UniProtKB/Swiss-Prot annotation:
It catalyses: S-adenosyl-L-methionine + H(+) = S-adenosyl 3-(methylsulfanyl)propylamine + CO2. Pfam families: AdoMet_dc (PF02675). Its cofactor is pyruvate. One of its GO terms (biological process) is spermidine biosynthetic process. Is synthesized initially as an inactive proenzyme. Formation of the active enzyme involves a self-maturation process in which the active site pyruvoyl group is generated from an internal serine residue via an autocatalytic post-translational modification. Two non-identical subunits are generated from the proenzyme in this reaction, and the pyruvate is formed at the N-terminus of the alpha chain, which is derived from the carboxyl end of the proenzyme. Pathway: Amine and polyamine biosynthesis; S-adenosylmethioninamine biosynthesis; S-adenosylmethioninamine from S-adenosyl-L-methionine: step 1/1. The record marks E62, S63 as: Cleavage (non-hydrolytic). One of its GO terms (molecular function) is adenosylmethionine decarboxylase activity. The modification Pyruvic acid (Ser) is found at S63. This is S-adenosylmethionine decarboxylase proenzyme. Belongs to the prokaryotic AdoMetDC family. Type 1 subfamily. Keywords: Autocatalytic cleavage, Decarboxylase, Lyase, Polyamine biosynthesis, Pyruvate, S-adenosyl-L-methionine, Schiff base, Spermidine biosynthesis, Zymogen.
Amino acid sequence: MNALGRHILAEIYGCDAAILNNRNLIEKIMVESALEAGAEVREVAFHKFSPQGVSGVVVISESHLAIHTWPELGYAAVDVFTCGEKVNPWDACNYLTERFKAKHMTATEVKRGVFEEPVKVANL
């Protein structure tokens, strides 16, 4: 069965707290990770929380990358969802793990849009 997309749910631990609490740097690294994976970036939106933490999304032509950070725990929750064959979501996850100076990353890949029977696409 072919899937429409691949969705990586990554748990990134032991990260540099200063990086995880820097909105501008998180945005830069997230955009770089999308490009590293071969994606085409469309939009970005990031928010810095008080007293700490950053959440954000990078919208790509192929879907999205999202992040939520807990600097006080050295932890980042990351989603990388890509459609098509051009972009490798694992490249983005590995890039993020390296740039966050993480000690450990675990991840699960979920196939999205898996149809057991042929689907007729409607003309819209």
